Amino acid sequence: LQQQMAIDWEKIIKSLMLLCFSILLFYLVISGQIQMYINPRFTVLSELAAVALLSMFAVQFFNSRNSFHVYDHHAPHKLVYVIFIIPLALFLLLPNAALDASVASNRGFNFNSGNLTSAPPGSGALARASAKSADLGESAGQQTDNTGVSKSGPIQVTADNFVRVVDAIGQSPEDYAGREIEMLGFVIRNKDFAPQEFGLIRFIITCCTADASPGGFILKSKDAVDYKDGTWINIRGVIEVDDYDQQVVPVIEATFIERAAQPSDPYVYP
């Protein structure tokens, strides 16, 4: 082995990788684009990770310039660098786009019942969503049932109460039959839909986009063919009960539809 005072290029390369990942995380957090990848409640963890990576870069870079380097004439395996370079290259080369109808079609969707979360009612994510929905109803001067759905007037499905309201209606559609509902979502279809039917959904993010699941309702409209998959629309309609795939499900009979812009944050969270 040969030992001499020199710049350790291997450590410099590693330190630059750490710097790039740190800059990437800082950029995503500052620009708000981090919400395209993870649940906002985990943003603080991304901030801490960016700071940690920046600190690791400083230590690694300092050590590369101020230490003896031992040469054993064995170059580091290039695959190690490829593993780090690929994510950076993908971020730079691929468009930063939200999950769309094609992803929803590939992942599939079960319209049969309220199935948006795996947590039992009254616990975990559903408990937080229920409390939030109830607070929203009370602040608006509306009485709500134990699911947070308003007892009178149109049911307004918002980004804040989406999971709880859609779950509640999906689990007990008969209880909400005849109620008017207003909702924003995007269009999706599958091979089982009739020409006048489509799904109106949004992606639900629990932790990150890897676990994203589409949730929403079947909607009926004589103008259904006018709206292509992926089109964002605002709708107003009446909840009906129908059979789908041998199960009772809520179906919205649309009375009003208008095209809408995709929200700045297209996802909803439990």
Predicted feature descriptions by range:
Residues 49, 222-235:
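Short nucleic-acid-contacting surface segments enriched for D/E, G, S/T with interspersed K/R
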Residues 73-100, 112-113:
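Internal/C-terminal transmembrane anchor helices
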Residues 96-177, 183:
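Membrane-interface segments at or immediately adjacent to transmembrane helices
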Residues 181-187, 230-239:
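OB-fold and OB-like beta-barrel modules that bind single-stranded nucleic acids
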Residues 194-205, 248-251:
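Short aromatic-glycine-enriched beta-strand elements
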Residues 212-226:
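Beta-strand/loop nucleic-acid-binding surfaces
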Residues 244-268:
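OB-fold/S1-family single-stranded nucleic acid-binding modules
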